[in-house]
Amino acid sequence: MTNIRKTHPLVKIINNSLVDLPAPSSLSAWWNFGSLLGVCLAVQILTGLFLAMHYTSDTATAFNSVTHICRDVNYGWLIRYLHANGASMFFICLYLHVGRGMYYGSYTYSETWNVGIILLFAVMATAFMGYVLPWGQMSFWGATVITNLLSAIPYIGTDLVQWIWGGFSVDKATLTRFFAFHFLLPFIVTALVMVHLLFLHETGSNNPTGIPSDSDMIPFHPYYTIKDMLGFLIMLAALSTLVLFSPDLLGDPDNYIPANPLNTPPHIKPEWYFLFAYAILRSIPNKLGGVLALVLSILILAIIPLLHTSKQRSMMFRPLSQCLFWLLVAVLFTLTWIGGQPVEYPFIIIGQTASVLYFLIILVFMPLTSLIENHLMKW
């Protein structure tokens, strides 16, 4: 009798991706974040679907519909806070996943890496548009400030901004289209995830040593399915704790004030996961320069494979590069902190220093350090 798992056209695909997939035997917990991102995406789509059943994308009723969800819908408060804090968990896993890729040299799988960068941009766009939907003060002013950045594009900027707004300011048309795109994008993200996995399974997984592991592979199931499930439990426990004990910890109190175009909040800032990029944007006094720096702060990931000068793939056996990597992490934490501070002394100069360091470490120090390490190893 033939095994349906290996013969059925649909089941065969799942089998080759999750059951009989050969995986390196040395994968550490840093390889858990891919599957955790899958769980985050599933949670977000599911909770988002239920929220969309009760939400109305109209400036007159959007804020009240969110209040209605929290007060009157059965477990609406739970669904809403799972969705809001689920986004935070999504970005924690995303940044750790990208960091893992940088540390262990996974970016040498260039197709997988490039699809990953597109995924990062798509998830960021989705999160930004989702933040606008509750139509609180920070929703409205965040949308106004961030979309207004496009006016820095020469010649077409102003027309482009008005085209996105659907008028001369952020208003009903903007909210409606943001809701439409916020609903659509996660499904595009899901399709991109499939492409990401397709490219990954063409090459097989990297491992902590960065050395080809073709001679030492184990089946994905049961070894890594069990390991992934432990990751799911830990993450869902952390998310549940956040949602049930302090659901507003990562949010902004200003968003509990209905949007008012006549009253600007004292400090306009995005959610915590965009603060590092926001700090880089603010550290350049010129508008166009700031916008370019903002885009390049993420797009710089695309040239990391070209800057790989080391003879070794992973940083596991490269202590100098490790020091630089953790310095980069410290710089990113500093930028995140600065992004949430007012634009005044000493925060301005700290932000500018950290922004310069961020680009210098990636573009100059890391490639040079790799060359020095090659020389020390007499390669």
UniProtKB/Swiss-Prot annotation:
Q: Which PROSITE patterns match?
A: CYTB_CTER, CYTB_NTER
* Amino acids binding heme b b562: H83, H182
Give the binding site residues for a ubiquinone. H201
Entry binding sites for heme b b566: H97, H196
- Other notes on this protein? Heme 1 (or BL or b562) is low-potential and absorbs at about 562 nm, and heme 2 (or BH or b566) is high-potential and absorbs at about 566 nm.
Q: Which GO terms describe its cellular component?
A: mitochondrial inner membrane; respiratory chain complex III
Provide the membrane topology annotation: Multi-pass membrane protein
Q: Which family does it belong to?
A: Belongs to the cytochrome b family.
List the keywords (alphabetical).
Answer: Electron transport, Heme, Iron, Membrane, Metal-binding, Mitochondrion, Mitochondrion inner membrane, Respiratory chain, Transmembrane, Transmembrane helix, Transport, Ubiquinone
InterPro entries in UniProt: Cyt_b/b6_C, Cyt_b/b6_C_sf, Cyt_b/b6_N, Cytb/b6-like_sf, Cytochrome_b, Cytochrome_b_C_euk/bac, Cytochrome_b_N_euk/bac, Di-haem_cyt_TM
UniProt cross-references to SUPFAM superfamilies, sorted A to Z: a domain/subunit of cytochrome bc1 complex (Ubiquinol-cytochrome c reductase), Transmembrane di-heme cytochromes
Tell me where in or outside the cell this protein is found.
Mitochondrion inner membrane
Question: How are cofactors bound according to the entry's free-text note?
Answer: Binds 2 heme b groups non-covalently.
Q: Does the keyword Membrane apply?
A: yes
Q: Name one GO molecular function term.
A: metal ion binding
Physiological role: Component of the ubiquinol-cytochrome c reductase complex (complex III or cytochrome b-c1 complex) that is part of the mitochondrial respiratory chain. The b-c1 complex mediates electron transfer from ubiquinol to cytochrome c. Contributes to the generation of a proton gradient across the mitochondrial membrane that is then used for ATP synthesis.
Name of the protein: Cytochrome b
Q: Which cofactor does it need?
A: heme b
Where is this chain primarily localised? Answer: mitochondrion
Sequence intervals crossing the membrane: 33-53, 77-98, 113-133, 178-198, 226-246, 288-308, 320-340, 347-367
Self-association or partners: how does it assemble? The cytochrome bc1 complex contains 11 subunits: 3 respiratory subunits (MT-CYB, CYC1 and UQCRFS1), 2 core proteins (UQCRC1 and UQCRC2) and 6 low-molecular weight proteins (UQCRH/QCR6, UQCRB/QCR7, UQCRQ/QCR8, UQCR10/QCR9, UQCR11/QCR10 and a cleavage product of UQCRFS1). This cytochrome bc1 complex then forms a dimer.
**Single GO biological process annotation from the record:** mitochondrial electron transport, ubiquinol to cytochrome c
